[in-house]
């Protein structure tokens, strides 16, 4: 009985630390795009701009920008105001000092989209430091639409 209780406590402790980051860069990116479904539920309306989501997914230097941006003409993470995503391809481009660069490619309504996620391994797991599209970065995009 004590072993079972110890196992449950260990699992719960692991879950609480995973709530503020992710175990791998690939897991982080997969979890971002899990929010981009067919909008049939609240979990498929795009990545929410609330404080809890910001804490889980973003580096502290990007959290305020994520939660305070309003009036964006499109969702930066899918490069469109609407989405119907095909398969998401994820690969590690390079690891450089404290940052890891993750290439992401997918089709959105039949249009090819490529993004580079720059992720860092924080105290609670992997989080997004920035995201680059061929023409812009998430940090610059959010600065344009800050509330």
Question: How would you name each of these model-derived features?
Answer:
Residues 5-14:
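Bacterial N-terminal signal peptides
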Residues 18-21:
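Boundary at the C-terminal end of the N-terminal hydrophobic targeting segment
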Residues 23, 55-111:
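Surface-exposed, charged secondary-structure patches
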Residues 23-41:
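Short, aromatic-enriched amphipathic alpha-helices that serve as compact interaction elements
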Residues 40-50:
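Surface-exposed patches in mature extracellular/periplasmic domains of secreted proteins
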Residues 95-99, 109-112, 130-147:
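Low-complexity, intrinsically disordered terminal/linker segments enriched in charged
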Residues 115-120:
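Hydrophobic/aromatic beta-strand elements that line small-molecule binding cavities or substrate pockets
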């Amino acid at each position: 009985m004590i072993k079972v209780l110890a196992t449950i406590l260990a699992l719960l402790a692991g879950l609480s630390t995973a709530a503020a980051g992710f175990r791998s860069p690939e897991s982080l990116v997969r979890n971002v795009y899990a929010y981009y479904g067919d909008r049939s539920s609240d979990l498929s309306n795009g990545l929410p701009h609330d404080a809890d989501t910001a804490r889980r997914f973003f580096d502290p230097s990007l959290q305020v920008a994520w939660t305070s941006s309003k009036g964006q003409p499109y969702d930066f993470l899918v490069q469109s105001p609407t989405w119907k995503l095909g398969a998401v391809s994820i690969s590690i481009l390079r690891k450089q000092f404290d940052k890891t660069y993750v290439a992401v490619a997918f089709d959105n309504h039949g249009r090819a989209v490529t993004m580079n996620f720059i992720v860092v391994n924080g105290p609670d797991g992997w989080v997004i430091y920035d995201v680059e599209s061929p023409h812009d970065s998430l940090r610059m995009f959010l600065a344009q639409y800050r509330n």
